[in-house]
Every structure is written in C-alpha cells, then in structure tokens.
Amino acid sequence: SKLYDYATTVYSRKQYTQWYDTKEGGYTFASFKEKTDSLSKTLTQYGIGAGDKVAILSQSMPNWSVAFFATAAFGRISIPILPDSSENEVTNIINHSESKVIFVSKRLVGKISQEIMARMTLVIELDTFEIMKVEDEKFTCDGKTSVPTPEDIATIIYTSGTTGSAKGVVLSHRNLTSNVITCYHSCKRT
C-alpha cells in the first residue's frame, strides 16, 4: 500500500502503461490511481473488505493491474488465475481460494461455470469494469478496507497444476515489496 501510494504520488504525471489498441492509449500514474481507487470503492460498496479474496481471470491487459491494485493495496487478497487454465481448473481455484468476486475478461468469461457465476457476490468484466452479476442489486454497505501490514497476505498465486491439482503459493506484502526492491537494486541507473 505504501509503495502504491508513493509511486502514484511521486510519478503522477509519468506514463504508467501504454497500449496501442484503444483510443485511451495508456495511463499516467495519476489516472491509474484514479481508476484503481474508484474500483476499490466499488468493491467496498458491495461489502468486499479487507481479507476477502478476489479472483482475476484474464489475458495480459492494462486493466489487470488496476484490478490487482484495487484488491491488494486496500487489504483484500488477489487470486490471479492463468488464462490458459481449463474451466475445471478455474472452478477448483475459485472454490479452494474461497473467492467472493471475480474480474474476468470478455475473452475468458466462458471459463466461468454457471455454478461459480451463481455463487459469486460480484462478477466484473475486466475490459470495461462493468458489473456482470451482483448477488443483490440493493446490497450496499461499507466493506471495511485497511492499510495492509507487511505480514498481510497480498496474493495467492496458483501453480499450473502440471503434477495434479493447482497449489496456492501465499505471498505477503513484504514478499512483493522485497521483489520490487531487488529489481530496483539490480537495474543500472544513470
């Protein structure tokens, strides 16, 4: 959370990401923060708070990182799912992780079984952030978010399951921050 706040404040005018297949063209750190904070508020509005698990099923796209940070930077736990996972693997990961919400790209929505779709509190289409399914249209409350501590779980990454069912690897905020620091120190700066 502190790294997110630092980067989106200090580098607010710099380009965060760029792509060439849409009119938008990319995000600055400031526009990334705006989208991420707005999406986090949507999750909070539907009662998705700190410690709740949020699955992300998508191919690589700019909005993937928006969904990840709207989840992890506010105390929720991100559950990324590989886009080449089968429908059965997607079902197993969502069931095992006890995810309440799923972000899914248009391209991969067919991998979400009717059973899983019915069980989700919230299903959000990742390409546009439109709500595809909500458990109760009238359900709104202030889900409690929190500033995560270094020991809090940030994400659970599931293996590809080449030797059986996928296994979850738990990574804390400290793990992710350590990776960023290592990358920073390994790059030559001029």
Predicted regions and their residues:
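A short N-terminal helical cap/helix-turn-helix that marks the beginning
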Residues: S1-Y16, E34
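Conserved pre-ATP/AMP-binding loop-to-beta segment of ANL
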Residues: S12-Q15, F139-Y158, S165, K188-T190
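ANL superfamily adenylate-forming
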Residues: D21, V109-P150, T177
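Conserved ATP-dependent adenylate/AMP-binding module captured primarily in the ANL superfamily
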Residues: P83-I112, N179-T190
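Conserved AMP-binding A3 loop
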Residues: G26-A30, A154-I181
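Conserved S/T- and glycine-rich ATP-binding loop of Class I adenylate-forming
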Residues: V54, T71, I102, I153, ...
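Conserved AMP-binding/adenylate-forming core of the ANL superfamily
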Residues: Y16-G47, D52-M61, S65-F69, S86-T91, ...
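Structured binding elements
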Residues: G75
